[in-house]
Amino acid sequence: MMATALTLRSMNRSDRDLYLFDTFEGMTRPQDVDIHASGQAAMTEFVEEQRGEDSSAVCYASLDEVKSAMARTGYDPARVHFIRGKVEETIPSQAPESIALLRLDTDWYESTRHELEHLYPRLSPGGILIIDDYGDWQGARKATDEFLANHAPGLFLSRIDDTGRLAVKP
């Protein structure tokens, strides 16, 4: 999201609200379907790095750390919204009605499925969808493929790199 804020600033645009949905406690508990491209079950890493019953030190950044990083971009802080909690609990109730850029980076099947189900319909025509973990985690890929087959057949996912995929909503 820092790159988005910096890009908007470089374009002299400060009229966009930025929403950051995160637990700010590390990764949530994965399911059996969440397997890395290497074949390792996500639960193995989760247990090794477990911080609490439902969180792991993997990808941990506190809310204060993220706020501080976003502040360094110089983007209008009144336009940056930090939504704390599991996406399954905060979306759709705290999501904006209209989305121009939707970047999903929650890794797991259940969270990716939930995000797509509730946020893709809010993505504006011509809006950009980025699935960060499509090439890394089987769960994220499965959730994406299932959703697109049922709700957006024919949507072309362009490969960004080994992990990311990008699409433009028709």
Q: Which sequence ranges carry the predicted segments?
A:
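S-adenosylmethionine/decaboxylated-SAM
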Residues: 1-170
